[in-house]
């Protein structure tokens, strides 16, 4: 629901959403790409999987190692701003890791900071994709529970004003 919010939006934006499963990594780009060129912030280890890694790498993602938060911040802000200036939108999952329960305390402001720095709007994204669980051998590829419903909802675009705290709170409330 809410795809009209980015379909009619001129220029690139930052999509900010919660992160429940690997499903978002597959589905979000295919939902957005017909209207906006898009990439995302991904953990480096995802690029090492056979088949999945090269497909993901073809989107020219912003890669973070998740071992040095300062380096990751620089990578997201600089890499994200460069892609946004090229006209490519960026998907950010500020929780940094998947969780079947949304916890606002673990939802950081990196996406808001990126949008403010680049001067582009944010599109909040509320996701319910816990139908795809974590795997035993490979955490990123687990079983799919076909009885569970998935849900993707896009909010209205918002510009980041001032510190961005109010917008971060609005995004958090949209997801909840």
Map each language-model feature to its residues.
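A conditional alpha-helix N-cap/helix-loop micro-motif detector
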Residues: 45, 69-73, 104, 168
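A cross-family acyltransferase "interaction/gating" segment
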Residues: 2, 38, 51-53, 89, ...
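Catalytic core of membrane glycerolipid acyltransferases/transacylases, capturing the structured
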Residues: 9-68
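Short, glycine/acidic-rich beta->alpha junctions
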Residues: 20, 24, 72, 103-107
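Active-site metal-binding loops of divalent metal-dependent hydrolases
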Residues: 96
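Residue-level preference for the first positions of well-ordered beta-strands
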Residues: 12-14, 87-93
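Hydrophobic/aromatic ligand-binding patch that stacks against planar heteroaromatic rings
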Residues: 31, 55, 82, 113-114
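N-terminal signal-anchor transmembrane helix
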Residues: 1-11
């Amino acid at each position: 629901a809410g795809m009209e919010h980015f379909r009619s939006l001129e220029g690139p934006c930052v999509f900010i959403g919660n992160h429940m499963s690997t499903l978002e990594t597959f589905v979000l780009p295919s939902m957005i790409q017909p209207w906006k060129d898009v990439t995302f912030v991904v953990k480096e280890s995802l690029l090492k999987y056979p088949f999945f890694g090269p497909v993901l790498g073809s989107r020219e993602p912003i890669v973070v190692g998740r071992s040095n938060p300062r380096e990751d911040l620089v990578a997201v802000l600089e890499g994200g701003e460069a892609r946004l200036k090229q006209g490519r939108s960026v998907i950010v999952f500020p929780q940094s890791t998947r969780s079947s329960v949304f916890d606002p305390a673990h939802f950081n402001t990196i996406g808001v900071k990126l949008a403010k720095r680049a001067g582009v709007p944010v599109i909040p994204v509320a996701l319910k994709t816990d139908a795809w669980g974590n795997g035993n051998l490979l955490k990123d590829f687990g079983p799919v529970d076909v009885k569970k419903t998935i849900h993707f909802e896009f909010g209205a675009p918002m510009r980041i004003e001032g510190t961005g705290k109010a917008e971060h709170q609005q995004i958090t409330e949209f997801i909840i």
